């Protein structure tokens, strides 16, 4: 499940995971209010797993709220604890070097899914970014980041 910019990275991850015979339900929230809880509950019931991707920090995040509600209302549907991929709880870095590990990317999503599925996949091997700098989403991006 994702929202905002991280959905682009999630789409990349899902495409790479499909090549490894791992099928994912990707829910793009598009809005965080109202949240389509029935869609989320159905996905958790179907897959037994939940990874929530958030472009906000971990503490006080929408991801935390979604995981909390799933744990309260659908905990018996989960095969394992849910996972949250969000930004760390500190200010966003402004130097190129510090941004390398700050923002979540498709590779991080693949690694989280791999761990959840007890598979030995490496996101960096499955995603070929070529010569695109780590802080540029893709070749079509023309603005500052």
Across the structure, where does each feature detected by a protein language model lie?
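Thiamine diphosphate
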Residues: 1-145
């Amino acid at each position: 499940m994702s929202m905002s910019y991280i959905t682009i990275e999630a789409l990349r991850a899902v495409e790479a995971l499909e090549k490894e015979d791992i099928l994912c339900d990707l829910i793009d929230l598009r809005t965080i209010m109202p949240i389509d809880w029935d869609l989320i509950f159905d996905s958790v019931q179907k897959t037994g797993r939940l990874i929530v991707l958030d472009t906000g920090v971990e503490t006080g995040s929408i991801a935390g709220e979604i995981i909390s509600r799933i744990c309260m209302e659908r905990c018996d549907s989960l095969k394992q604890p849910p996972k949250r991929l969000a930004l760390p709880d500190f200010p966003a870095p402004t130097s190129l070097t510090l941004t390398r590990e700050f923002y979540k990317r498709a590779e991080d999503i693949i690694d989280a899914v791999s761990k959840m599925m007890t598979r030995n996949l490496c996101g960096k091997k499955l995603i070929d970014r070529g010569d695109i700098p780590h802080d540029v989403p893709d070749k079509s991006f023309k603005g500052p980041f």
